[in-house]
């Protein structure tokens, strides 16, 4: 009975750790858009201004704006251009990242123009409170006071509406991924003008996503101090019920944007300014499209002869953890670190990342950092492991007595269980202690999996030999004889992938299992014999960095168990016969 409970505990623990996030999102869905709208309206916010960022619903049926002059963007980590037709940020490439591990592969493109197949861009504008005021739109031709935007040279775009209003966008970029855009209006009309400045991120297509419950890709933001994550699918369903609106909320400060696994495009208003956030399903030209917008809650009152200005920051780049932390501190952005999906166990996952990142900067290789990290974890749990292995050794010595009790009381299971428990108590043995180290390994395993899977630092991080990307699966495959046969078995089935490192992991798990005392129940013993095979195939599709961790952890466990048993007075068990 104890062994059955133990086996059940292991299964439940693994299920909870690997499935918690998916179950939570399934059973605790986000409130429907209508309910959120009612809640926001109750905060004293006029309903006619909530979510008032334009969507160009009518313009979406017209052809893309004409191509025109462009303002070049040349910074250390990004390059591209800004269209002067519409002042659209629609051409941005990340200098530090390639699409594949091949250094000759194209650089990662983050933003793309309307004329392409996958438009992804950022726009700025104004909404007047009075009709009849001409404001810049998607076809507006702006003038730039320079040809190239660099970190040392901001550029101002301007447009005169011909009726006494001059609209200006002063654009600056730093050495990393942060733009600042100051929207200003000069009023020479002779009367006051009331305007709401806005900004929006638009993705006029639905991208392919990883599809994992442990990773969010889609619309994201920290609004009123709360993280909001809406998938593309949820945006479609919520938007269909509420005229395209999936989420809206008024907040002082915050941030919002669209996130991919490694990349983020986010709007960051002044953190002391009251703004309205909205997430929308836009359906441009009848296909899926998405918009994240922010608009000033309180309008700019531009007096006659005066000028107004408001500044918004735009993050467009890779979700480098240290950079997010830096920007969070510099601009007082609330919880900007949550752009990286560290998950519900972030209180474990984040410290693990920082430890691995520190070790990486110490040794220069994330694979080696994982090995050192594993040694440190093993050392921290050594006292517990020592106690566990001593109890396991006692269990091995008690095996003949337990077998004798089973034979004596085979017709009375209740009495047999009582006698076995009395024997455990008398000898000071704990049948569950042998699996305690494995149970403790699961949260470490899950947290390390999150770190390797979601952080940009692990992307294309090499190890040794054939491992060029710790975040990807082992590229070798037993089923094509490790590349000797010219075909890809995964085209037949995704399960036909078994690399060298998963095989090493399975072998070390088998050796570790043989050092444990045999289970008294032959049925459960046979079940556990298949565990190395099951885990080998399971981990074959996991990031190879995680498989390396598990393999190294198994080897350390074998050595640790051998050392502990050698130091005790109990006889050191031999490997069980196969």
UniProtKB/Swiss-Prot annotation:
Compartments reported by the entry: Cell inner membrane
Transmembrane segments: 7-27, 362-382, 436-456, 491-511, 530-550
Coiled coil: none
Membrane topology: Multi-pass membrane protein
Gene3D superfamilies, per database record: 2.70.98.90
Disordered: region residues: 35-70
Protein name, UniProt field: Membrane protein insertase YidC
Lineage, top ranks: Bacteria, Pseudomonadati, Pseudomonadota, Alphaproteobacteria, Acetobacterales
């Amino acid at each position: 009975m104890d062994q059955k409970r133990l086996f059940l505990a292991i299964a439940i623990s693994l299920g909870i750790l690997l499935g918690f996030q998916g179950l939570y999102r399934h059973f605790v869905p986000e409130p429907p858009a209508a309910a959120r709208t009612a809640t926001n309206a109750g905060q004293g916010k006029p309903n006619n201004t909530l979510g008032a960022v334009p969507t160009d619903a009518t313009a979406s049926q017209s052809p893309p704006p004409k191509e025109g002059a462009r303002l070049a963007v040349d910074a250390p980590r990004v390059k591209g251009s800004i269209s002067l037709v519409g002042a659209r940020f629609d051409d941005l490439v990340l200098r530090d990242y390639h699409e594949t591990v091949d250094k000759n592969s194209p650089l990662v493109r983050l933003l793309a123009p309307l004329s392409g197949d996958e438009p992804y861009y950022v726009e700025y504008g104004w909404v007047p409170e009075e009709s009849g005021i001409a404001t810049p739109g998607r076809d507006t031709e702006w003038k730039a006071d320079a040809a190239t935007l660099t970190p040392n040279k901001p550029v101002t775009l301007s447009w005169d509406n011909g009726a006494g209003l001059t609209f200006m966008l002063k654009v600056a970029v730093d050495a990393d991924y942060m733009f600042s855009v100051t929207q200003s209006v000069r009023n020479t009309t002779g009367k006051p003008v009331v305007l709401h400045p806005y900004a929006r991120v638009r993705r006029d297509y639905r991208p392919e996503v990883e599809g994992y419950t442990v990773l969010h890709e889609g619309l994201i933001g920290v609004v009123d101090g709360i993280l909001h994550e809406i998938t593309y699918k949820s945006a479609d369903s919520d938007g269909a019920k509420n005229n395209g609106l999936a989420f809206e909320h008024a907040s002082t400060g915050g941030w919002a944007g669209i996130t991919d696994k490694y990349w983020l495009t986010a709007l960051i208003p002044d953190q002391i300014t009251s703004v309205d956030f909205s997430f929308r399903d836009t359906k441009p030209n009848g296909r899926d499209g998405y918009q994240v917008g922010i608009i000033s809650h309180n309008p700019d009152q531009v007096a006659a002869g005066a000028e107004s200005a408001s500044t918004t920051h735009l993050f467009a780049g890779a979700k480098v953890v240290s950079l997010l932390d830096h920007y969070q501190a510099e601009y007082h952005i609330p919880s900007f670190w949550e752009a990286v999906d560290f998950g519900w166990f972030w209180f474990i996952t984040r410290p693990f990342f920082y430890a691995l990142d520190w070790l990486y900067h110490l040794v220069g290789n994330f694979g080696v950092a994982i090995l050192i990290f594993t040694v440190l974890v093993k050392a921290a749990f050594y006292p517990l492991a020592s106690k566990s292995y001593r109890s396991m050794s006692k269990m091995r010595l008690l095996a003949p007595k337990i077998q004798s009790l089973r034979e004596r009381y085979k017709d009375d299971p209740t009495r047999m269980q009582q006698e076995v428990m009395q024997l455990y108590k008398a000898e000071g043995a704990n049948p569950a202690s042998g699996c305690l180290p494995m149970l403790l390994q699961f949260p470490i395993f899950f947290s390390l999996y999150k770190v390797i899977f979601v952080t940009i630092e692990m992307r294309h991080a090499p190890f040794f030999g054939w491992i060029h990307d710790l975040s990807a699966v082992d590229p070798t495959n037993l089923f094509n004889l490790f590349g000797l046969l010219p075909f890809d078995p995964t085209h037949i089935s995704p399960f036909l992938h078994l690399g060298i490192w998963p095989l090493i992991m399975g072998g070390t798990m088998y050796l570790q299992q043989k050092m444990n005392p045999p289970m008294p129940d032959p049925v459960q013993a046979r079940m556990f014999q298949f565990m190395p095979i099951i885990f080998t195939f399971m981990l074959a599709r996991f990031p190879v960095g995680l498989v390396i961790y598990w393999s190294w952890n198994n080897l350390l466990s074998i050595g640790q168990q051998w050392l502990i048993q050698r130091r005790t007075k109990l006889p050191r068990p031999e490997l069980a016969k196969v």
